[in-house]
Design a protein with these regions (language model features):
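A short beta-strand structural signal in non-transmembrane regions
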Residues: 1, 5, 261-266, 272, ...
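Juxtamembrane segments of multi-pass membrane proteins
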Residues: 202, 206-327
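Extracytoplasmic
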Residues: 1, 14-18, 296-364, 405
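Composition- and surface-driven signal marking solvent-exposed, interaction-prone regions
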Residues: 237, 264, 274-281, 285, ...
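Generic non-transmembrane alpha-helical segments
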Residues: 1-2, 254, 284-294, 373-392, ...
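Membrane-embedded transmembrane helical bundles of large multi-pass transporters/channels
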Residues: 2-233, 365-366, 384-613
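Amphipathic alpha-helical segments in well-structured domains
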Residues: 59, 111-114, 156, 192, ...
Length: 613
């Protein structure tokens, strides 16, 4: 039978949109499933699984509602947001539940445990959600509509996740029975406990080895960064084995590709496109472009006129060429008067007859080669033909050129976004801690994982392109959350232990370490699910973000406390307190005891209606 091959950018976009809709549903199910499984393995309690999932389900509905309210479409990027919200929102629940269980284990008072949970974790959770949102909201500084929509919807709903979490989780827990003994067993999880003890010993006894190992890893990563290169393909998101990609290869092999490139020639005067001299010039340009590799035969009014002349002489190949003076008037009259021809000609000549379009197709050879082909081959050929005539102006355009220039522009935009995220988060740290040393200490463990990931990209030949450059600001905004949680607890312990740094660090590792481990594991597996995507960019986003967050978990659990041990004296000016120390939940002794007996309604209370016995 006849084998059909489909291609063209409209067809490619349609197929990709259908796949995006399918993956939206797939990733929501996968993200909910994987987080539910991990929560159950950690907490061994259905309550600790169901409560977070209720919260996250509410926010997922909000995400889809936000997309609709803003009149956005579900794209390759916005389709990922529900799954990303699931993965990022669950750590809120982990920190809140862990604190609730820790407090309840101390005194067995549910109301007091809920109160302390909100007071001690609430503000820190807001700050961490805010820094995570910053990693997405900085994408608004780009001039790419797709990224702006992605950043805005994600940023808004990450902040909404905090609101829903801090309202619903304590509210639901207040109606549920107090935790039973088996629900608190995870606090004594021996494997996690031993691992945290090991980290504590490493920080206290071998911190300089931690620095040495970090320096070696960083050096190796920097060498990898030097091997990093930037290149993108117009359809590199499409899987290699898909029928769509095979059809694209067929068109590249047989028709030099499907990526459109247009040459616009303005002759400066109306009706000058049919001038014999101008037609010869365009013919000269087309003959120069014809033999180029990865470029299709040019199509314009010139190539059409040559084909009509051949048809006029009964298809004789000898007559394939521009009309001669003897047959020129007849052929041009035929071209102008036939309705089908007129419709065709309007695609290549404007209504004034002053501007002509020459259309080419280019193979998807990568942004670098495309840029070189356009700037160093095609444009010089155009200049060679038309440079002597000042009346004539030319321009190269089309989606291929937009892709090449847009890719370069986008990479620069994303670099600026990362820098902006870095600066904004540094300012937040400055407001919280009001100490330059603490700002530097908090940022180093989160900057090193970015360099490590960039190094891996260099060693494995993973190019820097929009889908991979995107991960750095996102991962940085997420990874800094662990630093904030650790430093917040560290500040609290400094007050409680009279500013004795070693004990403050040990207690901080013991109390926040398990939550940091749990949330990092959830984030790692939550982003890993994107490797099941059919889009190469989504796979890269998931894999590289997972790696970055995995590295950040270790740097925040080892390098951060080691830096504090060496560079933080623990001394504080008694008359000056940074913003983070102004909140009562940082001082253990200020916890107000809640007498649950006072919450009971007295039988003879005059303000309460009588009840029948």
């Amino acid at each position: 039978g006849i084998e059909l091959h489909y291609s063209g950018m409209p067809f490619v976009r349609t197929v990709m949109q259908e796949k995006t809709n399918d993956e939206l549903r797939l990733f929501i199910v996968l993200s909910l499933g994987i987080t539910a499984l991990i929560l159950f393995l950690f907490f061994r309690s259905w309550t600790s699984v169901v409560v977070p999932l209720i919260v996250i389900s509410v926010v997922v509905v909000w995400v889809l509602g936000t997309v609709g309210i803003l009149n956005y479409k579900i794209t390759v990027l916005t389709g990922l947001i529900p799954s990303i919200i699931v993965v990022i929102g669950i750590p809120n629940a982990v920190y809140l539940l862990n604190k609730y269980h820790q407090e309840f284990a101390k005194h067995g008072n549910k109301i007091k445990a809920l109160s302390r949970m909100v007071r001690k974790i609430g503000m820190v959770t807001f700050i961490t959600n805010f820094t995570t949102a910053i990693g997405f909201l900085v994408l608004l500084t780009t001039d790419i509509k797709l990224l702006k929509e992605f950043g805005l919807v994600a940023g808004i709903n990450i902040l909404a996740t905090f609101v829903v979490s801090i309202v619903l989780i304590p509210g639901i827990l207040s109606y549920l029975p107090a935790p039973k003994a088996n629900q608190l067993k995870h606090l004594e999880f021996k494997i996690v406990g031993r691992f945290l003890v090991l980290l504590d010993l490493l920080v206290h006894r071998h911190r300089y080895r931690v620095f040495a190992a970090t320096a070696v890893i960083l050096t190796v990563a920097i060498v990898g960064v030097t091997k990093l290169y930037s290149v993108a393909y117009m359809v590199d998101d499409i899987p290699e084995k898909s029928q769509l990609k095979q059809d694209l290869y067929f068109f590249e092999d047989n028709f030099s590709g499907v990526m459109p490139l247009e040459i616009i020639i303005d002759f400066g005067r109306p009706k000058s496109t049919i001038n014999a001299r101008n037609l010869r010039r365009v013919d000269q340009l087309e003959e120069a472009l014809e033999p180029l590799e990865n470029v299709s035969s040019p199509v314009s009014i010139v190539s059409f006129a040559k084909a009509v002349r051949q048809a006029f002489y009964n298809g004789n190949e000898r007559f394939y060429g521009l009309p001669s003076p003897s047959d020129r008037n007849v052929i041009l009259s035929y071209l102008s008067n036939q309705s089908d021809n007129a419709s065709f000609l309007s695609s290549f000549v404007d209504t004034t007859g002053q501007v002509m379009r020459v259309s080419l197709k280019i193979a998807d050879i990568g942004s670098n080669k495309m840029d070189s082909l356009i700037n160093h081959v095609i444009e010089p050929e155009i200049d060679k033909v038309f440079k002597d005539d000042e009346e004539i102006s030319t321009a190269v355009t089309g989606s291929t050129l937009l892709f090449v220039k847009g890719n370069q522009f986008l990479i620069e935009n994303l670099r600026f976004s990362l820098l902006l995220a870095f600066v904004i988060i540094a300012i937040i740290m400055a407001i919280l801690f009001a100490n330059i040393r603490m700002i530097v200490i908090s940022l180093i463990p989160n900057f090193i994982p970015l360099i490590m990931t960039a190094g891996i990209m260099g060693y494995f030949g993973i190019p820097l392109k929009p889908s991979t450059a995107l991960i750095f600001s996102i991962a940085f905004g997420i990874s800094v959350d662990d630093s904030i949680h650790f430093l917040a607890k560290y500040r609290q312990e400094l007050f409680a232990k009279k500013f004795f740094v070693p004990i403050a660090i040990s207690n901080s590792i013991k109390e926040t370490g398990s939550s940091m481990l749990y949330t990092s594991i959830i984030l790692f597996f939550g982003f890993v699910i994107f490797v099941f995507s059919d889009f190469g960019g989504t796979v890269a986003l998931g894999l590289l973000t997972s790696l970055t967050l995995f590295f950040a978990m270790f740097t925040n659990l080892t390098l951060l406390p080691a830096l504090l041990m060496v560079f933080d004296s623990g001394k504080r000016n008694q008359n000056f307190h940074p913003l983070i120390e102004h909140y009562e939940f940082y001082i253990e002794d200020e916890d107000e005891e809640i007498d649950t007996q006072n919450l009971l309604i007295k039988e003879n209370d005059p303000f309460v209606g009588t009840t029948k016995k």
